[in-house]
Amino acid sequence: KLPSREENPVRYLSVRYSMPETLVNRWIEDYGEEKTEKILTDFLTEKPITVRCRNHKYPQKEIYESLVDQGVEVKPAPYLPYAYEISNYNHILALDAFIQGKIQVQDVSSMLVAELAAPEAGNKIVDICAAPGGKSLHIAEKLWITDRNEAKKGEVEARDLTEYKVGLIEENIARMELENIHAVCRDATAPDEAWKEKADIVLADLPCSGLGVFGKKPDLKYRVKEE
């Protein structure tokens, strides 16, 4: 039985939506009870996986048919013509389109970064918190397109703090057979004189509280500390 909403709305919402009371209380203070409930409801709503089609290298129709042939449900994602929302499959690693490097798992919000960055031929680009590499890989591909007919070639350096995270980036680079991007283990808080005033574009998706991704990573809500 749920707690009484009238007697204790924080407790009610906490139990109803499986969210620590500390967070519920803070959000009610910030946003009010009605908006907080909408936020909590959204966290429990199943989200589709979004993939980026590498349609500069593979015909998008070919990618679509490969997914459908394996029983995947495919719908266009908003904003970008090369993005699909996919569902009705067991594991991304079992999909031929993924194995063959034709698609990359990536949120539309992440894809928009490369669109806004709009790299130009010969650009030097560094991503200081890159793992698993979605934005770095995407911008490397857009850079490759602009570089194709140019003598001066650009490069992307994808960095992260641990060898494990760098390994994730390297796996994706290898799967997608990209040559204008490399991964480096480096602490973003340490000055790097070698790159001082040399980068044309710097990507910095910095570590944060993770409060906005509880829907995808529900375990985080039990690790958040009040401070």
Question: For each of these PLM feature ranges, what is it?
Answer:
Residues 1-227:
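S-adenosylmethionine
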